[in-house]
Amino acid sequence: MRSRQPLMRCARCYAQAVLAVEMSLTPGRRHPSLYVRAMETFSRTPAGDWYLKRLAPQIDPWLLRLTGGRVSTLYPYTVMLLTTVGAKSGQPRTHPLGYLVVDDGLIVVASNYGAKSHPAWFRNLTANPKVDVLAGARSGTYVARVVDPGERDRYWALALDNYAGFDEYEQRAGDRTIPLVKLERITA
């Protein structure tokens, strides 16, 4: 058990750094650091695209579970493990997703990296809106709903403020409007 102590100490420090970054990314206060700009630039390269689509989804579930949802490979972006119930299979399906914190919940963007179709997790949660989230202090059971068109503009602006690459995804998606999903915590 001693071998995990340094890692957990590191995870706590990392979680504090993530919280500080979250606070700095509050709308109207975003001043991207050189690191954030470099991460966004990298994510738009073929290597970054490969990393986001292939490698991070393999590493992040393990890392997020190990650290209680506090640490992912995509620092400084906040990442959760979203567990949905399969629309056809009825089996639990877990996906690492970036998210935004809003006043009374969390927002996830169903961009599917700009693909012409919605991601599988989006189809699952529209069929079964009760989901589980592993995201540090925000972990819990939530109910999902697709954001109304009236709310979408405000949340889309927040999403673009957090990660400018969503604009490119929207262009790649063509006629598909990228849905935004609001997760609201279920209180016992």
Regions found by a protein language model. Give the residues of each.
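Extreme N-terminal basic, low-complexity initiation segments
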Residues: M1-M8
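Cysteine-centered motifs
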Residues: C10-C13
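Membrane-proximal basic amphipathic "stem/tether" segments
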Residues: L25-D60
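Short, structured beta-strand-loop surface elements
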Residues: P32, N112-F166, R172-T177, R185-T187
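Short, conserved active-site entrance elements at the starts or edges of catalytic domains
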Residues: G48-A87, Q91-P92
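Short beta-strand segments
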Residues: Y77-Y113
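Short beta-strand micro-motifs in enzyme catalytic cores
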Residues: M80, T177-V181
